Amino acid sequence: MQLMDTAKPHENTTKKIEYWWQTPVLNRRAWTWEDARNVKHQGEWWQNAVIYQISPQSFKDSDGNGVGDLNGIIEQLDYIASLGVDAIWLCPIYESPMEDFGYDITDMRDIDPLFGSLEDFKRLLAVAHSMGLKVMLDQVWSHTSDKHPWFLESRQNKNNPKADWYIWADPKPDGSPPNNWLSAFMGHSAWQWGPERKQFYMYNFLESQPDLNWHNPDVVDAILERAKFWLELGIDGFRIDAPNFFMHDAQLRDNPVRPEDAPLPDGVAPDNPVVRQLFKYNFCRRETLDALKPIRELMNQYPGTVGLGEVTFCEDSIALASEFVAGDERLHMAYHSGLLVDEPISAKLMRQMMEKVLSNFTQGGDCWIVGNHDYGRLRSRWTGKDAQGNPYPEKFYHMIATLLLSLPGAICLYQGDELGLTEARIPEDIPVEDIKDPFGQALYPAIKGRDGSRTPIPWQGDAPHAGFTTAEEPWLPVPESHYQRAVNLQNKDPNSLLNTWRRLLHWRKKQPALEAGNLELLDTEEPIFAFIRQYAEQRILCIFNLSNESARYDLSGYPGCEETKGLGFTTNRQGNTIEIPGYSVFFCNMPLSCDYQLKSN
């Protein structure tokens, strides 16, 4: 669970702060991406999977109440399968007061009636599996709802069986909170008074989301018992929400003030008051690595399942995420906020990103993500202008899809990004009084919240509410601009962004070098970003023009290079020089007999 209105650029030239995760805890041998892919080719599906993220409230409403549900997802599973993805990840569907879209849970083992029933979920699981789709569930283990039976018992007094299941602390002598920690959501004190116990309880997000005490082994056992319930049903894995928030400093020491010249944490809106502090004691703790061990031990009992951790909202998320997957006693995969940035996207940024990922994820486990339910829409974050001041053309987003699907590792694709949906605007598309996100409600207008990336999927361009619901009003409105990007309209257009994603996803499955190969970065100059992917008998040269102006690349060092056709991009080759139009791509297959010479272009 994160809370981004906008994210900072990846590169930061201000004062460097050192954190424990920037010095690897484990000794790591020299390693290549091919090592990790060998695991996949021995039967692990997740190493290079494309995972389609579904926000159930906004996907498809089947019963006319204005909110998406499980049966609505079942109705559209054939659409998801047609994309060529490998798995679906469902955001929380458990019993909840819905104060934070289901990330405030009261029962981790049952379905909220808003979405359907446990029988509906079992049917979804069966239908998805029949279509070759894996199913992953969101798991929220850092906190619960304040209406959860555990917390209702814990708050009564200091002596009950659940008294130490949450983080309680006495006030200071003057009655103020135990320390200076701030809520990541609200930006004020992370402590709320509990009059029954005459103590404060800690929360990192909303006051109604008290943090569980992961220092208590009984809490861990209870969480794993609930995880086992879903594994026994036959699900294929978990997306684990905010695992870097699991552990806190048991001494409750104050966080230091962030120096004015210190960089901001990755993916955190600069207007969020929480950035006034360094995240040293309240989360991102070293002891979290030990907390991952029992999770992995449980999942090892269910071969073929995967644990995918969300590691954002921290300083240097790439380095920290890599620690969460190092060795065989932690998570299988983790995603970071490396590409959850605002523009500009450039060859320099991409090279820096890849160099950092390759040097940190030395044992695999990287998962790429460019958008989700907590961040602004990809198309609205990367809305830059070319040299003439014109907005990025449509072809830019086709190029970005190709780039993402060419990188090593797994990929998360957020619903609607394949359609090129833009961020819903506040107040133009969503009136201020209709903001649903508590983060936006608390901090608007400095931060508009996350509603803009959670509006309903447009299924039909000529239907009320774009075919999402038959209700008079959906839970969030469908922006007017989204109707023209509806699924039924893009299905008919072979050159649509939707069909580009489909074409690329199905093509990628047939390319061992892209699915399983190592990656060699090439030394290029703006605006060219290029690399070579190789696995077994296949070697592919991948060249991207990250500008709207034509660019040339010298192919004389790559004899026998044959251009890959059918990807939807045009280039002009004259001898050993390839001219790549703006925001276009050149792929070529290189014979293994080619003794290529890396040269600066």
Predicted regions and their residues:
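Hydrophobic residues within beta-strands of alpha/beta enzymes
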Residues: 88, 238-240
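Short catalytic/ligand-binding loop motif for oxyanion handling, primarily in non-cytosolic enzymes
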Residues: 96-100, 143-150, 246-249, 315-319, ...
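C-terminal beta-strand-rich structural cap/linker in extracellular carbohydrate-active enzymes
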Residues: 574-601
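Beta-strand-rich binding/interaction modules
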Residues: 550-569
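Acidic/aromatic-lined carbohydrate-recognition and catalytic surfaces
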Residues: 2-228, 232, 245-315, 457
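Loop/helix patches that line or flank the sugar-binding groove of alpha-linked glycan CAZymes
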Residues: 16-21, 25-31, 45-47, 251, ...
